[in-house]
């Protein structure tokens, strides 16, 4: 569909980068002036530009111009945005299992509002691999998408093609939610921590390896109240109101940061950062990032593609500080599956890790094991902010595409064919039970 796109360039005064978010192999950013940019892998429509092309540099998502977007969030291969003024939640990308919330499982190559959420005031949105959640201003939670392990919190294992309210939170005001591959976590306004969904590695923090179909409160926090939570692929990170960091779940690659490879079934305080006040956290597929109140960024876990950002490709079992030019302080971080994004106080955006599909936004498809400035989004870039613009021709761009048109279902080692996780290239070792669908 590249021939249907008229590409030019937008040069404007520097705009503040408000939000960054990293998916499996794509990235998005929200800039002041109501500009949404996306880049990286586009095969499933997750970039929203009306085609299936990869983009190695940030490209303005013209379909959302004028919609006054206030948040953007990446799932693995889909994206969700919220317009506060219009009270609309938009979604696009890979649609299998209903993760787009439109009542079907088709892929969508341009943003479309979710009818079931029209008119609802949204406070926060979280996207996992194949499911999504939205927290309303009233503290209620809506969930939709894949639910084979109960990650929607609805009390069953049926996928939901449209958002449904989590009834288990009736009378409980939720502050925020986080979504992993097949599990979910939440923090209440009162600082209580909850987990539900797939719990095989202790990633629910409930002291066992059992799935939960409805949210269950985590009681083993030593009396600490939590202010935030984030989910990696199969691990979970939380921060208390005192700024202490806790991790639990899968630790095969050191992603819990405790200096070993042991899983933890309950929240375990990360002593290596006990002298720091943690202000933000993010979980990748097998790596973790934590930002301190004084602008220092620490990373640990799986580092095959340099996604930890410390200048090598060795796994890190304990936190290591990520260094930036001129010791710039970091104000925001987001982990993708195998890449990481960060924004500094000077309004510069950096990326590192896997770059095969252009998800680093640096204009080329190469890996980086240390922070590389995204010149198109950064004030300190060689030419300042210089964002490409794609103008979609609505008469010729893609809209709905059924997954059956582009994928074949293959059996796993048990002979079953009802699995989920789609591979993103042959460069990774994915458990056989995770690979059930392949492109044709």
Curated annotation (Swiss-Prot):
Coiled coil: none
MF terms in GO: chromatin binding; guanyl-nucleotide exchange factor activity; identical protein binding; photoreceptor activity; protein homodimerization activity
Keyword Ion transport: no
Impact reported for residue 285 to F: Loss of function. Constitutive homodimer and no interaction with COP1
Disruption phenotype: Hypersensitivity to ultraviolet-B (UV-B) illumination. Abrogated induction of DHU1 in response to UV-B. Disruption in a plant lacking DHU1 alleviates its hypersensitivity to UV-B.
Residue stretches of each RCC1 repeat: 2-31, 32-84, 86-137, 139-189, 190-241, 243-293, 294-345, 347-399
Disulfide cross-links: none
Region (Disordered): 413-440
InterPro entries documented for this protein: RCC1/BLIP-II, Reg_chr_condens, Ub_ligase/GEF_domain
Subunit structure and binding partners: Homodimer in the absence of UV-B, but absorption of UV-B induces monomerization of UVR8 and interaction with COP1. Interacts with RUP1, RUP2 and histone H2B.
Protein name (record): Ultraviolet-B receptor UVR8
Organism: Arabidopsis thaliana
Record lineage: Eukaryota, Viridiplantae, Streptophyta, Embryophyta, Tracheophyta
Gene label: UVR8
């Amino acid at each position: 569909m590249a021939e249907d796109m008229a590409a030019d360039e937008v040069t404007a005064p520097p705009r503040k980068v408000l939000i960054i978010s990293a998916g499996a192999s794509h990235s998005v950013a929200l800039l002041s002036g109501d500009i949404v940019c996306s880049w990286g892998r586009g095969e499933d429509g997750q970039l929203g530009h009306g085609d299936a092309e990869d983009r190695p540099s940030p490209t303005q998502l013209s379909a959302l111009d004028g919609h006054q977007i206030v948040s953007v969030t990446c799932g693995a291969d889909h994206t969700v945005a919220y317009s506060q003024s219009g009270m609309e939640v938009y979604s696009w990308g890979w649609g299998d299992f209903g993760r787009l919330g439109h009542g079907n499982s088709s892929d969508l190559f341009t943003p479309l509002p979710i009818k079931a959420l029209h008119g609802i005031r949204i406070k926060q949105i979280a996207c996992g691999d194949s499911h999504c959640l939205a927290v309303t201003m009233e503290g209620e939670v809506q969930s939709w998408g894949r639910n084979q392990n109960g990650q929607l919190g609805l009390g069953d294992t049926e996928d939901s093609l449209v958002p449904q309210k989590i009834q288990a939170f009736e009378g409980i005001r939720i502050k925020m939610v986080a979504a992993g591959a097949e599990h979910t976590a939440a923090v209440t306004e009162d600082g209580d921590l909850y987990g539900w969904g797939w719990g095989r590695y202790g990633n629910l923090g409930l002291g066992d390896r059992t799935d939960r179909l409805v949210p269950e409160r985590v009681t083993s926090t030593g009396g600490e109240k939590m202010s935030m939570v984030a989910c990696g692929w199969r691990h979970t990170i939380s921060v208390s109101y005192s700024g202490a960091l806790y991790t639990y779940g899968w630790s095969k690659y050191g992603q819990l940061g405790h200096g070993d490879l042991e899983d933890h079934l309950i929240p375990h305080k990360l002593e290596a950062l006990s002298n720091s006040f943690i202000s933000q956290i993010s979980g990748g597929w097998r790596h973790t990032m934590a930002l301190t109140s004084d602008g220092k960024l620490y990373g640990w876990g799986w580092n095959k593609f340099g996604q930890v950002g410390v200048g090598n490709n060795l796994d890190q079992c304990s936190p290591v500080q990520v260094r930036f030019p001129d010791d710039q302080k970091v104000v925001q971080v987001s982990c993708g599956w195998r890449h990481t994004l960060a924004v500094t106080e000077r309004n510069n955006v950096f990326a590192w890790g896997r770059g095969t599909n252009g998800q680093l936004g640096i204009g080329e498809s190469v890996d980086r094991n240390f922070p590389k400035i995204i010149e198109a989004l950064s004030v300190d870039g060689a030419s300042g902010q210089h964002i490409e613009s794609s103008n979609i021709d609505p008469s010729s761009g893609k809209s709905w595409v059924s997954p059956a048109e582009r994928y074949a279902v293959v059996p796993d080692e048990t002979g079953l064919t009802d699995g989920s996780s789609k591979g993103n290239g042959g460069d990774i070792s994915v458990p056989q039970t995770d690979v059930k669908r392949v492109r044709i």
